[in-house]
């Protein structure tokens, strides 16, 4: 899939579930549960045991799922993830060399940033979308709206503090998509609960887009 198509898919679905798990098997079960709810995008964090293997398995067995590598802190890790099937790369922080590595492979990169200076620096370095993290620590949707006022040209995906209760507020504030963690994909939850959560979030995004 071309880079532009990946970004278009991320924006269309409007959600990036942040997958954390205690084992590769649990991660694969959660990934299937998310997809069953209609959300065919997910971010496999490097904190998952055997994360690279999980990405490889998903790439081989679930071509319907858009696979992202999360919590990527350096270019070497980014390269490993890309070679094993990651179609976009996400980080909680800004590493210019990681951005450059993703450019080398023509892969969308979503580095983390929080302050206006960090966000602009990430954008100028070539970030396709900036992950505003942790959004909740700075006031949530109100903070995102404040950022978007002077920086409408920078696409942002808030992560941290996104919930069913706040999702619409973040979309109203101008979010490119929503990064959602345990509120959607709690590793302790039953798969059917995760599927129901995915459906719930997808309904919120679709309802918002229909009214916009």
Can you say where each PLM-predicted feature lies in the sequence?
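Conserved N-terminal beta1-alpha1 strand-loop-helix module at the mouth
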Residues: 1-85, 104, 156, 164-165, ...
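Short secondary-structure boundary segments
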Residues: 46, 71, 92-94, 113-115, ...
